[in-house]
Protein backbone atom coordinates (compact mmCIF):
# COMPACT_ATOMS: atom_id res chain seq x y z
CA UNK A 1 0.00 0.00 0.00
CA UNK A 2 1.51 3.31 -1.07
CA UNK A 3 0.47 6.03 1.35
CA UNK A 4 2.01 9.33 2.35
CA UNK A 5 3.14 9.68 5.94
CA UNK A 6 5.00 12.40 7.79
CA UNK A 7 8.43 11.34 8.97
CA UNK A 8 10.07 13.06 11.93
CA UNK A 9 13.83 12.65 11.77
CA UNK A 10 14.34 14.36 15.11
CA UNK A 11 12.45 16.32 17.71
CA UNK A 12 12.46 20.11 17.65
CA UNK A 13 14.53 20.08 20.87
CA UNK A 14 17.45 18.46 19.02
CA UNK A 15 17.63 21.03 16.25
CA UNK A 16 19.81 24.12 16.39
CA UNK A 17 17.74 27.31 16.24
CA UNK A 18 17.32 28.42 12.66
CA UNK A 19 15.55 31.36 11.09
CA UNK A 20 14.76 31.58 7.43
CA UNK A 21 13.46 34.91 6.23
CA UNK A 22 11.81 35.00 2.85
CA UNK A 23 11.60 38.20 0.89
CA UNK A 24 9.34 37.63 -2.12
CA UNK A 25 10.51 40.88 -3.73
CA UNK A 26 14.07 39.53 -4.14
CA UNK A 27 14.79 36.66 -6.47
CA UNK A 28 18.27 35.21 -6.82
CA UNK A 29 17.61 32.07 -8.79
CA UNK A 30 14.82 29.80 -9.94
CA UNK A 31 14.33 26.15 -9.20
CA UNK A 32 13.87 24.27 -12.43
CA UNK A 33 12.74 21.02 -10.86
CA UNK A 34 13.48 17.93 -8.83
CA UNK A 35 14.10 14.38 -9.86
CA UNK A 36 15.59 10.99 -9.34
CA UNK A 37 18.18 8.73 -10.88
CA UNK A 38 17.32 5.38 -12.37
CA UNK A 39 20.08 2.82 -12.80
CA UNK A 40 20.33 -0.69 -14.17
CA UNK A 41 19.93 -2.18 -10.69
CA UNK A 42 16.94 0.06 -9.95
CA UNK A 43 15.23 -0.90 -13.19
CA UNK A 44 16.02 -4.60 -12.74
CA UNK A 45 14.39 -4.53 -9.30
CA UNK A 46 11.40 -2.53 -10.52
CA UNK A 47 10.82 -5.16 -13.20
CA UNK A 48 10.67 -7.84 -10.49
CA UNK A 49 7.54 -6.19 -9.08
CA UNK A 50 4.03 -7.07 -10.17
CA UNK A 51 3.24 -4.73 -13.09
CA UNK A 52 0.33 -3.09 -11.25
CA UNK A 53 2.48 -2.48 -8.13
CA UNK A 54 5.33 -1.08 -10.21
CA UNK A 55 2.97 1.20 -12.12
CA UNK A 56 1.43 2.43 -8.85
CA UNK A 57 4.90 3.13 -7.42
CA UNK A 58 6.06 4.95 -10.56
CA UNK A 59 2.81 6.94 -10.63
CA UNK A 60 3.30 7.98 -6.98
CA UNK A 61 6.82 9.06 -7.83
CA UNK A 62 6.50 10.72 -11.24
CA UNK A 63 2.88 11.75 -11.85
CA UNK A 64 2.16 15.47 -11.69
CA UNK A 65 -1.34 15.01 -10.29
CA UNK A 66 -1.13 11.66 -8.44
CA UNK A 67 2.40 11.73 -7.09
CA UNK A 68 5.50 13.77 -6.35
CA UNK A 69 5.62 15.11 -9.88
CA UNK A 70 9.36 14.77 -10.37
CA UNK A 71 10.46 16.75 -13.40
CA UNK A 72 13.88 15.17 -14.07
CA UNK A 73 15.38 11.72 -14.42
CA UNK A 74 19.12 11.13 -14.54
CA UNK A 75 20.38 8.03 -16.26
CA UNK A 76 23.86 6.77 -16.90
CA UNK A 77 25.54 6.56 -20.28
CA UNK A 78 26.86 3.02 -19.93
CA UNK A 79 27.24 1.52 -16.48
CA UNK A 80 27.19 3.31 -13.16
CA UNK A 81 28.13 2.32 -9.64
CA UNK A 82 24.57 0.93 -9.36
CA UNK A 83 24.63 -1.25 -12.47
CA UNK A 84 24.35 -5.00 -12.67
CA UNK A 85 27.74 -5.20 -14.40
CA UNK A 86 30.57 -3.02 -15.66
CA UNK A 87 30.19 -1.97 -19.29
CA UNK A 88 30.19 0.90 -21.71
CA UNK A 89 28.42 1.07 -25.03
CA UNK A 90 31.75 0.61 -26.79
CA UNK A 91 33.94 -1.85 -24.90
CA UNK A 92 35.71 -3.00 -28.06
CA UNK A 93 38.26 -0.46 -29.30
CA UNK A 94 36.89 1.67 -32.12
CA UNK A 95 33.80 3.86 -32.04
CA UNK A 96 32.33 1.78 -34.88
CA UNK A 97 31.63 -0.90 -32.24
CA UNK A 98 29.14 1.33 -30.38
CA UNK A 99 25.90 -0.40 -29.35
CA UNK A 100 23.42 -0.16 -26.49
CA UNK A 101 23.95 -3.02 -24.06
CA UNK A 102 21.48 -5.53 -22.62
CA UNK A 103 21.15 -3.68 -19.30
CA UNK A 104 19.93 -0.61 -21.16
CA UNK A 105 17.71 -2.52 -23.59
CA UNK A 106 16.24 -5.02 -21.12
CA UNK A 107 15.85 -2.89 -17.99
CA UNK A 108 16.47 0.84 -18.34
CA UNK A 109 14.54 1.53 -21.55
CA UNK A 110 11.35 -0.33 -20.50
CA UNK A 111 11.23 1.48 -17.14
CA UNK A 112 12.06 4.84 -18.68
CA UNK A 113 9.29 4.36 -21.25
CA UNK A 114 6.82 3.47 -18.50
CA UNK A 115 7.80 6.58 -16.53
CA UNK A 116 7.42 8.75 -19.63
CA UNK A 117 3.97 7.25 -20.26
CA UNK A 118 3.01 8.47 -16.77
CA UNK A 119 4.62 11.90 -17.16
CA UNK A 120 5.74 12.72 -20.72
CA UNK A 121 7.10 16.12 -19.68
CA UNK A 122 9.94 14.67 -17.60
CA UNK A 123 13.36 15.82 -18.76
CA UNK A 124 15.99 13.11 -19.13
CA UNK A 125 19.56 14.01 -18.22
CA UNK A 126 22.38 11.56 -18.91
CA UNK A 127 25.89 11.31 -17.51
CA UNK A 128 28.58 8.68 -18.01
CA UNK A 129 30.20 7.01 -15.04
CA UNK A 130 33.26 6.29 -17.17
CA UNK A 131 34.45 6.52 -20.72
CA UNK A 132 35.31 3.27 -22.51
CA UNK A 133 38.48 1.85 -20.95
CA UNK A 134 40.35 1.87 -24.26
CA UNK A 135 40.07 5.67 -24.21
CA UNK A 136 41.78 5.99 -20.80
CA UNK A 137 45.32 6.88 -19.82
CA UNK A 138 47.04 6.95 -16.45
CA UNK A 139 47.17 10.77 -16.42
CA UNK A 140 47.41 13.66 -18.84
CA UNK A 141 51.16 13.78 -18.19
CA UNK A 142 51.56 10.00 -18.49
CA UNK A 143 49.66 8.80 -21.54
CA UNK A 144 50.18 5.15 -20.68
CA UNK A 145 46.95 3.25 -21.45
CA UNK A 146 45.03 2.34 -18.30
CA UNK A 147 42.65 -0.63 -18.11
CA UNK A 148 40.47 0.61 -15.25
CA UNK A 149 36.79 1.29 -14.63
CA UNK A 150 37.41 3.70 -11.77
CA UNK A 151 40.74 5.45 -12.37
CA UNK A 152 42.47 7.31 -15.15
CA UNK A 153 41.63 10.15 -17.48
CA UNK A 154 40.34 10.51 -21.00
CA UNK A 155 43.21 10.43 -23.49
CA UNK A 156 43.14 13.69 -25.49
CA UNK A 157 43.71 11.60 -28.63
CA UNK A 158 40.16 10.24 -28.13
CA UNK A 159 38.29 13.50 -27.52
CA UNK A 160 36.57 13.26 -30.91
CA UNK A 161 35.69 9.58 -30.41
CA UNK A 162 34.25 10.38 -26.99
CA UNK A 163 32.16 13.20 -28.47
CA UNK A 164 30.93 10.75 -31.11
CA UNK A 165 30.17 8.25 -28.33
CA UNK A 166 27.85 10.82 -26.72
CA UNK A 167 26.16 11.58 -30.05
CA UNK A 168 25.65 7.88 -30.85
CA UNK A 169 24.20 7.29 -27.39
CA UNK A 170 21.71 10.17 -27.74
CA UNK A 171 20.78 8.95 -31.23
CA UNK A 172 20.24 5.39 -29.93
CA UNK A 173 17.87 6.64 -27.22
CA UNK A 174 16.11 8.92 -29.73
CA UNK A 175 15.58 5.85 -31.94
CA UNK A 176 13.80 4.27 -28.95
CA UNK A 177 11.51 7.30 -28.65
CA UNK A 178 13.40 8.86 -25.72
CA UNK A 179 14.32 12.54 -25.99
CA UNK A 180 17.45 13.46 -24.06
CA UNK A 181 17.26 16.92 -22.50
CA UNK A 182 20.94 17.18 -21.57
CA UNK A 183 24.16 15.23 -21.22
CA UNK A 184 26.95 16.02 -18.82
CA UNK A 185 30.52 14.75 -18.90
CA UNK A 186 31.92 13.30 -15.72
Which residue stretches match the model-derived regions?
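Short, conserved phosphate-binding/catalytic loop or strand-edge motifs used
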Residues: 185-186
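N-terminal catalytic cores of secreted or lumenal carbohydrate-active enzymes
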Residues: 2-180
Amino acid sequence: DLTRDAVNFSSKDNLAPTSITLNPTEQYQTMDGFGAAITGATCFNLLQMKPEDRHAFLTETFSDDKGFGFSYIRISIGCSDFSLSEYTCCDTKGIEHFALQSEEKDYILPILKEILSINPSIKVIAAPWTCPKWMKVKSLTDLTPLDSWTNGQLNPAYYQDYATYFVKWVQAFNAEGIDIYAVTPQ
